[in-house]
């Protein structure tokens, strides 16, 4: 419910910096958004290392 209220308030009130200037989130935080290439890029996963936790075999 808190998230819903936060989104509603965000749409009605602009975000301001400490000097009272409006902040355009779409422009200022564009560098932090993920590109489509990153989301569709497929890389092979490396094999997992084999761990042996059986200490009785170690002598």
UniProtKB/Swiss-Prot annotation:
Topology in membrane: Lipid-anchor
Modification after translation (UniProt): Myristoylation and palmitoylation (probably on one or more of the nearby cysteines at the N-terminus) enable membrane-binding and Golgi apparatus-specific targeting and are essential for efficient packaging.
Subcellular location(s) per record: Virion tegument; Virion membrane; Host cell membrane; Host Golgi apparatus membrane
GO biological process: viral budding from Golgi membrane
Region (Disordered): 40-59
Lipid-conjugated positions (N-myristoyl glycine): 2
Predominant cellular place of this UniProt entry's protein: virion
One cellular component term from this protein's GO annotations in UniProt: host cell plasma membrane
Source species, domain of life: Viruses
One of the Pfam families matching this protein, by short name: Herpesvir_UL11
UniProt KW keywords: Host cell membrane, Host Golgi apparatus, Host membrane, Lipoprotein, Membrane, Myristate, Palmitate, Phosphoprotein, Virion, Virion tegument
TM region(s), chain numbering: none
Self-association state and partner proteins as the record states: Interacts with cytoplasmic envelopment protein 2; this interaction is essential for the proper localization of each protein to the assembly complex and thus for the production of infectious virus.
HAMAP family listed in its UniProt record: HSV_CEP3_gammahv (MF_04042)
Protein name: Cytoplasmic envelopment protein 3
Source organism: Alcelaphine herpesvirus 1 (strain C500) (AlHV-1)
